[in-house]
Curated annotation (Swiss-Prot):
WD repeats lie at residues 241-281, 289-330, 342-387, 402-441, 461-501, 506-544. Keywords: Cytoplasm, Meiosis, Repeat, WD repeat. One of its GO terms (biological process) is transport along microtubule. Has a role in meiotic nuclear divsion where it promotes the movement of 'horsetails'. The keyword Repeat applies. The lineage of its organism: Eukaryota, Fungi, Dikarya, Ascomycota, Taphrinomycotina. This is Dynein intermediate chain 1. It holds the Pfam family WD40. GO terms for molecular function: ATP hydrolysis activity; dynein heavy chain binding; dynein light chain binding. Its main location: cytoplasm. It is found in: Cytoplasm. The keyword Cytoplasm applies.
Length: 544
């Protein structure tokens, strides 16, 4: 009897265990199944448990990258990483916000995505076009971020409860009309370089274009020009390059994106800021370009097109159309007689008469100041009659600037054109472009016409060689000059005609180029060490 009872108990226990296992399996298959538990065989149960214990869909859907060729993915990662490296080299957010990392590792990011529990969509660019778009986006975004971080607003932390500082605390330099703002320099790009030219943009008042050279090297280096932004002082806005050293570079006053430059080998380059850092057009010797270094560039409005005018030490002035650099539209020979065998005049600087596209003044290496007239035809023409000469300088003329006076002064006459010339003879001279009869000196000559000598109105003596001079745009009686001692001199003809009203030596190095900001009071000067200094000119009314 006892044996039968034990046997029945074991049978019931086995049935209960089997029912319990079946209920657990059905709950694992689907908790939302409304039908009752079904009979599952041991093979089906084992297969089901294997599917649960060894899932095949745990890795995220990142096979789109692996399904492509491995070479394309590796190239893509390398290109993207190079873009991030160039981005981090030009703009390091961690310099301003330390909590942000400087670099981004693409490979570490991809590993993290592959081992994550979720499956995010991968949007890494795989084509060259997408990588170029990403590169342009990063560079443009970096500039915008850096401009915002570098914006130094004096009104941001103004405390209106504190008494304003007294004017007595101002430096003597500020009281006399100059205030040093900041300095443009880049040790990686402009180290051991010399500033060849400085020019402001006529469309964007904050943009400044400078060209550089490295005279210490035995061979002439490739050309370098930098577009600086006065609102973004940490790094250049754009870097322009050329095959030869850029001797002069000026932006177009008629197009906001075009910049023309002259080179040491005689070529003329034209850059478009929308097309990258290399020229979109350039001249050659075969096309009738210059044979010697280009010394100056200017623009004239000659409807229906706007022309680029270049002069060189080869004694020629070329007039170019921006859309056709195959040959100059006009050539002017800087000599007294076209058909004579005399040597051409080596031009060093050039400036057109305001509101007159037919007349210009050009300085030469021998100190002569010549008056030129454009021809209505494409043939070579003499620069001026042989019986007219400007007497004053006797050595190299380094700079020239012409303006129309809108004020009356002892030396300036209203609505008349006046020119300033700087020279290596330690002087700056003032000339009237259309002098009156009493400024002429008649000298007997064997020719039928009398020799006419035009003398300068005033001579401003300096303490060293003068490298450049420019009229002030906002103050008609003021001009600035720079010399070999590193002096930035500010002259005011209404205050003193014998000495500058103020002077400053930015860093003790010689200064050789200067430029005024259009319709503003900012002044830029560059030196032989590659630094560009920005000053603010305070008029007497503002200074007082």
């Amino acid at each position: 009897m006892d044996k039968n009872i034990k046997r029945e108990i074991e049978i019931k226990r086995a049935k209960l265990l089997l029912l319990k296992n079946k209920e657990n399996c059905t709950d694992a298959v689907s908790s939302s199944n409304k039908e009752g538990p079904k009979q599952i065989s041991e093979d089906q149960l084992s297969n089901f448990l294997c599917k649960i214990l060894k899932p095949t869909n745990l890795t995220p859907q990142t096979y789109s990258l692996e399904s492509k060729s491995s070479n394309l993915v590796s190239d893509c990662e390398l290109k993207i990483s190079s873009v991030y490296q160039s981005y981090s080299s030009t703009f390091n957010v961690s310099n301003h916000v330390p909590s942000i990392s400087k670099t981004v590792n693409i490979r570490e990011t991809s590993k993290h995505l592959k081992h994550s529990t979720k499956a995010p969509k991968c949007s890494l660019p795989t084509s060259a076009l997408e990588i170029d778009h990403l590169n342009n986006f990063l560079h443009s975004s970096a500039k915008i971020l850096d401009r915002a971080l570098c914006d130094q607003s004096n009104q941001l932390f103004t405390d209106y409860t504190v008494k304003k500082k007294s004017k007595k605390n101002k430096s003597q330099l500020e009281e006399n009309g100059l205030n040093h703002l900041f300095t443009f320099q880049d040790e990686k790009i402009t180290l051991n370089s010399v500033v060849n030219s400085i020019s402001y943009s006529s469309f964007f008042e904050e943009l400044l274009i400078t060209s550089y050279a490295k005279p210490k090297e035995a061979l002439r280096t490739r050309g370098l020009a930098i577009v600086w932004n006065q609102r973004w002082k940490n790094s250049p806005e754009s870097v322009l390059k050329a095959r030869s050293e850029i001797t002069v570079c000026k932006p177009s006053p008629f197009h906001p994106q075009l910049i023309a430059g002259g080179a040491y080998n005689g070529q003329v380059f034209l850059w478009d800021l929308r097309q990258g850092q290399y020229p979109v057009s350039f001249t050659t010797i075969i096309s009738g370009g210059h044979l010697e270094p280009v010394t100056d560039i200017t623009y004239i409005n000659n409807p229906p097109s706007n022309n680029i005018v270049t002069c060189s030490t080869d004694g020629l002035v070329h007039i170019w159309e921006p859309d056709m650099f195959s040959r100059p539209s006009e050539t002017i020979c800087l000599s007294s007689q076209v058909d004579s065998s005399s040597q051409c005049i080596p031009a060093t600087c050039l400036s057109f008469i305001p509101e007159n596209n037919m007349e210009f003044l050009v300085g030469a290496e021998d100190g002569k100041l010549q008056r030129g007239y454009r021809s209505d035809y494409s043939e070579t023409k003499a620069v001026q009659p042989s019986n007219v000469s400007y007497e004053g300088h006797n050595v190299f003329i380094s700079g020239i600037d012409v303006m129309t006076s809108n004020s009356q002064n002892v030396f300036l006459e209203k609505n008349k054109d006046f020119a300033l010339t700087s020279s290596f003879d330690w002087t700056v001279r003032l000339w009237q472009c259309s002098p009156s009869r009493n400024q002429h000196e008649l000298v007997p000559s064997n020719d039928l016409d009398e020799q006419v000598i035009i003398n300068s109105c005033k001579t401003f003596t300096h303490k060293a060689m003068v490298f450049d001079v420019k009229w002030c745009v906002s103050e008609p009686c003021c001009f600035a000059s720079v010399d070999a001692l590193g002096n930035l001199n500010l002259w005011d003809l209404q205050k003193d005609v014998e000495a500058p009203v103020t002077s400053d030596i930015p860093d003790g190095k010689p200064l050789n180029k200067i430029a005024w900001q259009p319709e503003k009071r900012n002044l830029a000067c560059g030196g032989l060490n590659g630094n560009v200094h920005i000053y603010k000119h305070l008029s007497p009314n503002l200074a007082n």
